[in-house]
């Protein structure tokens, strides 16, 4: 019974008038909100995107934390980006770090511990009226590393599958080659044995199988028959003729000494003497026979 009364009292509390109800406090935005974006086209059509109104537009997004010091300044009717007041406060705050009107605005969420001591936390940017949360460096690095590892592992997997396919193809090719060779050799030897069974002589095969006695005997050295190439002979003759033409003519023979008669002249005179019937004494060669007076005595 007590529980029913408590539930009834609770129902009366939440089902009362809207003016009597207390709105629940807004939850602070989460740390990772990179998967969402915010855009209010009605506000963009009503107000310009500049330094004076851009913070009011950012305060409409779910990225805005109502517990920040900028909200306290707004309630005091002070510009929420006034650095002279923000530097005197401690806690969470938003700072406009970069602005390129009207396309790009960059806000930084930071924690202030003193006038000159701040700790950056998150970064947001407004691009052409759409608000986004910038990813943290560690998240970007982890995503890039995971993507790289995935691509490398996929490349190795594809390469391994292709190598396996190539290996299987090579095995099939080798088996086919071995089978074809075995079939061809078998048919070849079968044909040879059939011819030999019929009494026909197979050139080289009968000697390889049956003529084993002659293998131990020394082979007789047969003179190699030299073949004469007529074209080669003509080419050598042409070369020798051209060389002979290029050489200078031989010098004339030296003159004979006085009283010397060559053997050719003596032969001619003897022939003439025999023909005339007169025998003449042979002339003495002065170089060969010089007489007893000019010979050396030993």
Curated annotation (Swiss-Prot):
GO terms for cellular component: mediator complex. Residues 248-257 have a biased composition (Pro residues). GO terms for molecular function: transcription coregulator activity. It is found in: Nucleus. GO terms for biological process: regulation of transcription by RNA polymerase II. Keywords: Nucleus, Transcription, Transcription regulation. Its main location: nucleus. InterPro entries: Mediator_Med6, Mediator_Med6_sf. It comes from the Eukaryota. Residues 245-298 are annotated as: Disordered. Coiled coil: none annotated. Belongs to the Mediator complex subunit 6 family. Component of the Mediator complex. Interacts with MED2. Component of the Mediator complex, a coactivator involved in the regulated transcription of nearly all RNA polymerase II-dependent genes. Mediator functions as a bridge to convey information from gene-specific regulatory proteins to the basal RNA polymerase II transcription machinery. The Mediator complex, having a compact conformation in its free form, is recruited to promoters by direct interactions with regulatory proteins and serves for the assembly of a functional preinitiation complex with RNA polymerase II and the general transcription factors. This is Mediator of RNA polymerase II transcription subunit 6. The lineage of its organism: Eukaryota, Viridiplantae, Streptophyta, Embryophyta, Tracheophyta.
């Amino acid at each position: 019974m007590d529980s029913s009364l408590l539930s009834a009292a609770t129902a009366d509390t939440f089902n009362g008038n809207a003016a009597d109800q207390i709105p629940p406090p807004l939850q602070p935005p989460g740390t990772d909100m990179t998967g969402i974006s915010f855009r209010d086209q009605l506000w963009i059509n009503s107000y310009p995107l500049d330094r004076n109104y851009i913070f009011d537009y950012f305060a409409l997004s779910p990225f805005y934390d109502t517990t920040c010091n900028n909200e306290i300044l707004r309630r005091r009717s002070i510009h929420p980006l006034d650095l002279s007041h923000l530097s005197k406060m401690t806690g969470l705050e938003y700072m406009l770090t970069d602005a390129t009107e009207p396309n790009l605005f960059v806000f930084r969420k930071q924690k202030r511990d003193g006038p000159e001591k701040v700790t950056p936390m998150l970064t947001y940017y407004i691009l052409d009226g759409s608000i986004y949360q910038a990813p943290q460096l560690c998240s970007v690095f982890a995503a890039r590393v995971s993507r790289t590892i995935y691509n490398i592992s996929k490349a190795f997997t594809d390469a391994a599958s292709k190598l396996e396919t190539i290996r299987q193809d090579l095995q099939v090719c080798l088996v086919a080659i071995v089978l074809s060779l075995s079939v061809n050799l078998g048919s070849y030897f079968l044909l040879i044995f059939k011819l030999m069974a019929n009494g026909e002589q197979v050139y080289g095969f009968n000697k390889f199988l049956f003529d084993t006695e002659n293998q131990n005997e020394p082979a007789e050295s047969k003179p190699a028959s030299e073949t004469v190439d007529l074209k080669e002979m003509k080419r050598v003759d042409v070369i020798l003729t051209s060389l002979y033409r290029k050489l200078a003519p031989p010098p004339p023979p030296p003159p004979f000494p006085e009283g010397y008669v060559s053997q050719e002249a003596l032969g001619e005179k003897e022939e003439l003497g025999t023909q005339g019937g007169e025998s003449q004494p042979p002339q003495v060669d002065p170089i060969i026979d010089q007489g007893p007076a000019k010979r050396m005595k030993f």
